[in-house]
C-alpha cells in the first residue's frame, strides 16, 4: 500500500495533523529509549547513577543534533525534488544521503569513544560520577552509525509524506529497548552500562528495519546498496541546507552545556533534579520538533511545485497548531507534572525541586512557537543559514551572556534557568521580524 502523501493539494490542516501525529508519537517512543534508561537506572541503581546518565544528555545531544540537522537537509532536498516530480534527482539524493549517514556516523562514533571523559570533565561533571558518566557516554556513541542511518532513512520516508512507517519501527524498537533494559539492568545487574547497551541494540534494530523498507520499496525512493555513493551536486545542496540546520540544533546544545556547567556547581542532588525535569520537559520539545518536521516537509514539497501561496497558508496553520499544543501542555504539566516526577525518583527532595522548576518554566512554552514554525518554513524553502544565525544570537549568545554576567548576581538554580524563557521570547521576536522580510523576498507577500 502506498503511504506517501502529496502535500501540494488537499486540506492543509488535515494534512499537517495527519502527518504530525505519527511523528509526535514516534518522537515519544524515541524519547522512551532514554526515559526508560533513566527510570530503571534511577530506581535500580540510585541517585548517583541517575545523575551520571543525566549529566551526559547535553553532550550527546550536541553531536546527535548535528546529524539530525544533516538528515533534515536530506529530507528537504528530497521533498523539493518529490514536489517537482524529478525522479532522477530523488534517486541521487537517496543514495547520497545514505552515504552521508555512514560517514558522519563513523566520525561521531570515534569522537564519542575517544573524547567522552575529557568533554564531561570540561563541563564540570562531579568526580564522584565522572567515570560512570564517561562509560555511559562511550557506550551510547557506539550506536552513532545505526542512529545516523535510521535518522536519514526515516527522513527520506517523511520527505515523501510517509510518517507512519518510522512510527511503526520506533514502537518495535522501544519494546526491544524496554526488554533489554530490564534484562541487563534489573536481572543481570549491569548498571548504566546495561542501559546504554540496550539503547544501542534498539537503534540497530531501527536502522535495519528502515533500510529493509527502502530496499524493497517499489517507489521512486528505492534504495540499492550497491549504488550508495556521493553525487556531488546533490551532496552540496544537502550540506548547504543540512549543515546550518545541524549547527542551529547544536546551538541549543552548546547553550545548554554552558547552563549545565553552572547547574553542576549546585551538586549531585540538583543535577538529578534537573535531569528529571529535562525528561518531562522533552514532551514539549518532541511536540515542537514534530510540527517543525511537518511544516518543513509541507513547505519543501510546495516549494518544489512553486505553490507559494499554499506555503504561507501552511505556515499560519502550523503556528496555530503549535500555540494550541504549547498552552495545553503547559496547563497539563503544571497541574500533573509531579506525578510524572515520581516515576523517575522516590527522593522527596528531588521531587519537590523538580516540581518547582516545572511551575517556574513551563508556563512560558508558548513564547517559543514562532522559532520552530518560521525556522521550518524557511528551511523548507532551502534557506537554512539565516535561521541558524538568529538562533545563534537569540539562544546561544544570549544564554551564555546571561549565565556569565547576570546569573552570578542571583546565585540560585532559578537565577540560571530563567535564561530559557528570556531567550525564547527574544528569539521569537527576531524570527517574526525576519520572516516578514523573507516573505517579501521569496513570495512577493
Regions from the language model: what does each represent?
Residues 50-110, 147-166, 273-337, 368-391:
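Small-residue-rich hydrophobic transmembrane alpha-helices
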Residues 71, 140-158, 166-174, 195-210, ...:
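Short runs within selected transmembrane alpha-helices of multi-pass transporters and secretion channels
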Residues 30, 34, 38, 42, ...:
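Juxtamembrane/transmembrane-helix interface segments of polytopic membrane transporters
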Residues 23-76, 140-147, 236-302, 322-330, ...:
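Transmembrane helix-bundle signature of multi-pass secondary active exporters and lipid flippases
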Residues 62-65, 177-182, 207-211, 283-286, ...:
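Hydrophobic transmembrane alpha-helices of multi-pass small-molecule transporters
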Residues 1-20, 78-143, 187-243, 299-364, ...:
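Short alpha-helical transmembrane segments in multi-pass integral membrane proteins
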Residues 35, 44-47, 81-84, 159-160, ...:
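Helix-loop interface residues and adjacent transmembrane-helix termini in multi-pass membrane transporters
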Residues 35-38, 110, 152-156, 178-183, ...:
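Alpha-helical transmembrane segments of multipass membrane proteins
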Amino acid at each position: 500500500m502506498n503511504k506517501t502523501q502529496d502535500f501540494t493539494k488537499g486540506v492543509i490542516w488535515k494534512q499537517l495533523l495527519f502527518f504530525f501525529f505519527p511523528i509526535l508519537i514516534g518522537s515519544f517512543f524515541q524519547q522512551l529509549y532514554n526515559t526508560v534508561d533513566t527510570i530503571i537506572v534511577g530506581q535500580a541503581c540510585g541517585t548517583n547513577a541517575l545523575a551520571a546518565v543525566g549529566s551526559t544528555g547535553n553532550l550527546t545531544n550536541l553531536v546527535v543534533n548535528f546529524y539530525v540537522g544533516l538528515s533534515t537537509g536530506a529530507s528537504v532536498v528530497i521533498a523539493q525534488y518529490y514536489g517537482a516530480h524529478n525522479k532522477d534527482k530523488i534517486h541521487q539524493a537517496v543514495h547520497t544521503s545514505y552515504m552521508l549517514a555512514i560517514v558522519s556516523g563513523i566520525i561521531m562514533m570515534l569522537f564519542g569513544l575517544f573524547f567522552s571523559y575529557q568533554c564531561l570533565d570540561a563541563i564540570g561533571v562531579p568526580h564522584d560520577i565522572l567515570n560512570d558518566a564517561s562509560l555511559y557516554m562511550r557506550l551510547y556513541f557506539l550506536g552513532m552509525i545505526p542512529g545516523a542511518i535510521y535518522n536519514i532513512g526515516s527522513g527520506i520516508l517523511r520527505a515523501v509524506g510517509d510518517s507512519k512507517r518510522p512510527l511503526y519501527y520506533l514502537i518495535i524498537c522501544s519494546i526491544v529497548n524496554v526488554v533489554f533494559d530490564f534484562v541487563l539492568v534489573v536481572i543481570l545487574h549491569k548498571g548504566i552500562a546495561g542501559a546504554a547497551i540496550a539503547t544501542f541494540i534498539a537503534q540497530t534494530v531501527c536502522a535495519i528495519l528502515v533500510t529493509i523498507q527502502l530496499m524493497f520499496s517499489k517507489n521512486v525512493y528505492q534504495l540499492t546498496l550497491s549504488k550508495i555513493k556521493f553525487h556531488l551536486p546533490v551532496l552540496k545542496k544537502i550540506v548547504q541546507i543540512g549543515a546550518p540546520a545541524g549547527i542551529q540544533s547544536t546551538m541549543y546544545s552548546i547553550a545548554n552545556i554552558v547552563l549545565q556547567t553552572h547547574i553542576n556547581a549546585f551538586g549531585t542532588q540538583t543535577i538529578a533534579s534537573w535531569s528529571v525535569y529535562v525528561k518531562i520537559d522533552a514532551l514539549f520539545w518532541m511536540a515542537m520538533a514534530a510540527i517543525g518536521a511537518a511544516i518543513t516537509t509541507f513547505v519543501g514539497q510546495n516549494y518544489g511545485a512553486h505553490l507559494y501561496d499554499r506555503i504561507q497558508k501552511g505556515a499560519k496553520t502550523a503556528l496555530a497548531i503549535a500555540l494550541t499544543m504549547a498552552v495545553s501542555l503547559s496547563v497539563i504539566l503544571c497541574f500533573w507534572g509531579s506525578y510524572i516526577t515520581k516515576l523517575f525518583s522516590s527522593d522527596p527532595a528531588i521531587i519537590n525541586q523538580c516540581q518547582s522548576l516545572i511551575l517556574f518554566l513551563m508556563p512560558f512554552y508558548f513564547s517559543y512557537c514562532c522559532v520552530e514554525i518560521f525556522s521550518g518554513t524557511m528551511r523548507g524553502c532551502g534557506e537554512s543559514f539565516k535561521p541558524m544565525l538568529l538562533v545563534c544570537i537569540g539562544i546561544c549568545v544570549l544564554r551564555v551572556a546571561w549565565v556569565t554576567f547576570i546569573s552570578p548576581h542571583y546565585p540560585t538554580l532559578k537565577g540560571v534557568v530563567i535564561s530559557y524563557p528570556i531567550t525564547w521570547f527574544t528569539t521569537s521576536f527576531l524570527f517574526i521580524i525576519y520572516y516578514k522580510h523573507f516573505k517579501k523576498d521569496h513570495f512577493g507577500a
